[in-house]
Curated annotation (Swiss-Prot):
Its main location: membrane. Changing residue 25 to V: Abnormal cell wall deposition. A lipid is attached at residue 202 (S-geranylgeranyl cysteine). Changing residue 27 to N: Defective in cell separation. The gene is rho3. It is found in: Cell membrane. Belongs to the small GTPase superfamily. Rho family. Residues 203-205 form a propeptide. Pfam families: Ras (PF00071). This is GTP-binding protein rho3. GTP binds at residues 20-27, 67-71, 125-128. The modification Cysteine methyl ester is found at residue 202. The keyword Iron-sulfur does not apply. It comes from Schizosaccharomyces pombe (strain 972 / ATCC 24843). One of its GO terms (biological process) is actin filament organization.
Length: 205
């Protein structure tokens, strides 16, 4: 017997893994997006999974967001996060040139090894520091938009985004764009001989 009530459409599941150096701001970004608050105390993350629903381009999407530890001692544990991933968000902090350098020297090689063919989104964090007083930050060391965009092109990311979790600027936009990319992506990271290329088309920054 058929029901006279229409069944609710099931959300589309997409998995996004968030990578980047320790203290880059990944967990703060996720807290603001999923819980609506900015943590005042830094607590290093070993591993955490967030589930958050989002509506993009007429589609209801269930995002599984995997927060990972950036410290070297967790490299093996982090490798377990990559299975069946649709998009990887690689993050760096605009006040840490090491974190941007590691996008290319550490994170890209790790992704290529564990999750070949996955779509990449590069995200600049702590962008509020660009407007901070000289007493708070050395502006000669701050990474500007053009440098971030150049890095995104170098790793063949399909999006380059900038945000401030502290001010809640660009946070929703970052995950909306990542979800949009994930919608059209195939899951990677199953060691199935996937295509090694990380992205096609031009960056939308």
């Amino acid at each position: 017997m058929s029901s006279c009530f229409g069944s609710k459409k099931k959300p589309i599941y997409r998995k996004i893994v968030i990578l980047g150096d320790g203290a880059a701001g990944k967990t703060s970004l996720l807290n603001v997006f999923t819980k609506g608050y900015f943590p005042q105390v830094y607590e290093p993350t070993i591993f955490e999974n967030y589930i958050h629903d989002i509506f993009v381009d007429g589609n209801s999407i269930e995002l599984s967001l995997w927060d990972t530890a950036g410290q070297e001692e967790y490299d093996q544990l982090r490798s377990l996060s990559y299975s069946d991933t649709h998009v990887i968000m690689i993050c760096f902090a605009v006040d840490s040139r090491d974190s941007l350098e590691n996008v290319i020297t550490k994170w890209l090689p790790e992704v290529s090894s564990n999750c070949p063919g996955v779509k990449l989104v590069l995200v600049a964090l702590k962008c509020d520091l660009r407007g901070a007083d000289e007493e708070q930050v050395d502006h000669s060391k701050i990474i500007d938009y053009e440098e971030g965009l150049a890095a995104a092109k170098k790793i063949n990311a399909v999006r380059y985004l900038e945000c401030s979790a502290k001010l809640n600027r660009g946070v929703n936009e970052a995950f909306t764009e990542a979800a949009r990319v994930a919608l059209a992506a195939q899951p990677r990271g199953t060691k199935d001989g996937a295509d090694e290329s990380h992205g096609t088309g031009c960056i939308i920054a």
